[in-house]
Design a protein with these regions (language model features):
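Positively charged, solvent-exposed patches that mediate nucleic-acid binding
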Residues: 1-141
Length: 141
């Protein structure tokens, strides 16, 4: 791995905008992949700076959202653990998507990871599934 890669997870990489989240889940252009216990919902969007205020505020090529439903884990401690595992796995392997998007100028990805299982998994298993999903997404771009 080149030394120039930064394995950080900054605020700009988080999907926080209600408008973009609605576009991802309600809009009909998103795609979904599953690798149990995770499901990835993603949407490839154009970055158009001429739109002004209506343009998505994307300073990074990928924005992610992590969701662990209360239906699966009643205790917040367990939900937070799973979210932390997913964020860490993304942070360590985000170059899979970033390298692919550097080839396609003007494109951005909105990505949501949704937990599907009622059981906790170890970090290595979660990282393997996140990596698998990101590789499959990069192949479909």
């Amino acid at each position: 791995m080149p030394a120039s890669r930064r394995f950080t997870f900054s605020k700009e990489e988080r999907l926080c905008s209600k408008k973009l989240i609605d576009q991802l889940f309600v809009g009909g252009n998103s795609r979904s992949l599953a690798a149990f216990p995770l499901r990835a919902v993603y949407q490839l969007i154009d970055r158009n700076p001429e739109l002004g205020d209506n343009a998505p505020d994307l300073t990074t090529p990928v924005k992610i959202l992590v969701s662990v439903p209360k239906k699966h884990f009643k205790r917040a401690v367990k939900r937070n653990r799973v979210k932390r595992q997913i964020r860490e796995a993304y942070r360590k392997n985000k170059y899979i998507l970033w390298d692919k998007l550097s080839e396609t100028a003007g494109k951005e990805i909105l990505l949501a990871f949704v937990w599907l299982d009622d059981e906790l998994h170890d970090s290595a298993a979660v990282e393997a599934k996140v990596c698998n999903l990101m590789q499959r997404i990069s192949e479909r771009l």
